[in-house]
């Protein structure tokens, strides 16, 4: 009995020792699971670009090629690389159905597992450069960011891209024996290629991979890496060019199907060549405008990076207002609120984090590690070329792990240089400025504590709003019971209810114009397209009728107002032909008459 008792204590002691050694892994897994706990069940969110990814996967699963089946003529796709659609197709093939009511919940399960792996991968990478506590902090900053868990709720490429990018950095940062060089190179290549085939922004990983070898003067290795990267990039760009020069592309199913503003149906290069893709009447961007765009985006990047490490500017301002209301004992959300604390004070922690990232990148370079700095700078450079500053927070989600690790490295380095034993700290104390060094140390600690407090508050707020917002209007996608999603407010619910009416009251061959065409197709089976973005109402109406569009949905969506700005004037100017046949609060459905049913 004593021997058994001793063995039991030994096993418990060993388990306790392992737990103490791996407490950091346990912490980040718990954070990841807690972030998914309120949303374990139900389908993955298929709004926005997610609907396109799902439909492309359906086309692949059915053996119909890489096409968008929701569009008239099912045109070939060339905007999105094919790896995420292939991932969707794999689920559909295994489940033997393309029905989103069955497949979407399984996709959510896959994203839960992916999110857990993502958390552990960030921690593993962070531990290469940081102490365990700082590595956990870097991982938590990334996981608790509102955009990270929002992107994990959508069938978007951001989460798998970020996982592949972190995996690439883990593999490429290893220094194995020469005999293991090529297995490592092949693994790094596979992960970089996967990143590129998820989002073309993965080009930054290839660039970093090649430059890493050049900086280390491994000329032959750099040449081999460049050749390997060229193969993947050339294959995708060759496919894009083949589609663009095809007869089908040059003679589309309807006149504006391949217009440059049709961002789902054209290449990135063609879309970003516009001055503003959502205001195509401004025309193509000249060299001067492109340079101006780059300069403007570069100026806004420090704040965007600071927000990517903490939270979005709006949540900082909201927390500041709530603090002031509580301190002054004012009712929350009062319309007559006059702030005493300047709102722009929130820019101090935001820019401070941006500076910490710079300090961290410098620390990487001083250590001789160029890979992560080049990934970060290359990714930021690509983002700066885009005309969508409102999308920066989404794009930065994919590189957020590198930003948080760099930021925490900068934080750790700044904290250490202020200590008494460090040269700078000792110099300050020698000049009787030790109080200033301690003040800066407390400031750094306070910055981190404040950021975590704001992030946790934002998590609770966003989840509370998710629960209080109206659930999705029941359809085949959600089943009998509507589900809750992030940022699914009343305009979305009204749109879904209006779309349900269309599904019940239109013929199967109807073509509908709406701001969310792919999601409409998934919910109703009706072909759907974006409205023509033409400032001339008569031109827009002619294009709609030439498709021919049978119904136009004018919504109140906040994320995209093209139906109100372009489609509404077109149908309102011809009340004899276009009449309102149904409305749900602010959502109106116009029908072209006469329509044979």
Where do the model's predicted regions map?
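Start-transfer (signal-anchor) and selected internal transmembrane alpha helices
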Residues: 1-37, 218, 222-228, 351-352, ...
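Signature aromatic-anchored transmembrane alpha helix within multi-pass, membrane-resident enzymes
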Residues: 24-30, 190, 206-207, 211, ...
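Transmembrane alpha-helix segments characteristic
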Residues: 31, 142, 187-192, 346-385, ...
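Multi-pass, polyprenyl lipid-linked donor-dependent membrane glycosyltransferases
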Residues: 48, 106-114, 137-167, 172, ...
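Hydrophobic, aromatic-rich transmembrane alpha-helices
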Residues: 122, 301-368, 407-410, 415
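Loop-to-helix entry region of an early transmembrane alpha helix in multi-pass inner-membrane enzymes
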Residues: 82-86, 96-120, 151, 155, ...
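Membrane-lumen/periplasm interface segments of specific transmembrane helices
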Residues: 219-336, 447-464
């Amino acid at each position: 009995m004593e021997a058994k008792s001793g063995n039991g204590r030994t096993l418990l002691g060993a388990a306790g020792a392992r737990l103490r050694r791996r407490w950091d892994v346990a912490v980040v897994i718990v954070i990841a699971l807690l972030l998914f706990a309120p949303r374990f069940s139900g389908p993955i969110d298929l709004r926005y670009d997610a609907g396109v990814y799902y439909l492309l996967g359906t086309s692949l699963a059915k053996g119909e090629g890489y096409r968008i089946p929701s569009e008239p003529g099912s045109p070939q796709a060339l905007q999105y690389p094919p790896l995420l659609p292939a991932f969707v197709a794999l689920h559909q093939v295994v489940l033997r159905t393309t029905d989103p009511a069955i497949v979407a919940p399984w996709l959510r399960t896959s994203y839960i597992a992916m999110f857990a792996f993502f958390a552990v991968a960030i921690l593993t990478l962070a531990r290469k450069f940081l102490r365990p506590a700082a590595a956990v902090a870097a991982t938590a900053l990334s996981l608790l960011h509102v955009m990270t868990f929002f992107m994990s709720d959508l069938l978007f490429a951001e989460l798998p891209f970020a996982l592949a990018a972190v995996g690439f950095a883990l593999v490429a940062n290893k220094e194995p024996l020469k005999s293991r060089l090529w297995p490592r190179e092949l693994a790094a290549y596979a992960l970089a290629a996967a990143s590129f085939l998820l989002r073309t922004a993965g080009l930054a990983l290839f660039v970093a991979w090649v430059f890493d070898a050049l900086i280390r003067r491994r000329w032959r290795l750099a040449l081999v890496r460049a050749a390997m990267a060229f193969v993947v990039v050339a294959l995708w760009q060759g496919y894009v060019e083949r589609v663009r020069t095809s007869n089908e592309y040059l003679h589309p199913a309807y006149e504006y199907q391949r217009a440059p503003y049709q961002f789902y149906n054209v290449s990135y290069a063609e879309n970003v060549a516009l001055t503003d893709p959502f205001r195509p009447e401004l025309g193509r961007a000249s060299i001067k405008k492109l340079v101006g765009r780059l300069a403007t985006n570069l100026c806004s990047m420090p704040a965007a990076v600071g927000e990517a490490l903490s939270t979005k500017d709006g949540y900082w301002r909201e927390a500041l207002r709530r603090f002031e209301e509580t301190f002054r004992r004012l009712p929350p959300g009062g319309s007559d609120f006059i702030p005493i604390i300047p709102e722009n004070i929130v820019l101090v922690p935001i820019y401070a984090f941006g500076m910490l990232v710079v300090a961290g990148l410098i620390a990487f370079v001083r250590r001789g590690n160029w890979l992560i700095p080049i990934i970060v700078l290359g990714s930021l450079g690509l983002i700066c070329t885009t005309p969508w500053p409102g999308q920066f927070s989404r794009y930065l989600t994919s590189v957020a792990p590198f930003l948080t690790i760099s930021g925490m490295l900068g934080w750790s380095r700044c904290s250490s240089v202020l200590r008494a034993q460090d040269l700078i700290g000792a110099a300050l104390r020698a000049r009787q400025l030790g109080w200033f060094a301690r003040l800066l140390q407390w400031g750094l600690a306070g910055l981190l504590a404040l950021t975590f407090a704001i992030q946790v508050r934002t998590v609770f707020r966003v989840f509370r709003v998710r629960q209080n917002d109206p659930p999705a209007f029941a359809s085949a996608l959600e089943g009998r019971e509507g589900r809750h999603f992030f940022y699914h407010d009343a305009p979305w619910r009204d749109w879904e209810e209006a779309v349900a009416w269309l599904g019940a009251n239109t013929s199967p061959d109807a073509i509908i114009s709406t701001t969310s065409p792919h999601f409409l197709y998934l919910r109703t089976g009706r072909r759907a397209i974006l409205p023509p973005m033409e400032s001339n109402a008569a031109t827009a109406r002619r294009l709609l009728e030439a498709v021919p569009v049978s119904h136009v949905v004018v919504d109140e969506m906040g994320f995209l107002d093209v139906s109100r700005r372009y489609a509404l004037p077109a149908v309102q100017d011809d009340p004899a032909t276009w009449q309102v046949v149904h409305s749900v609060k602010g959502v109106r459905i116009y029908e072209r008459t006469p329509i044979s049913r």
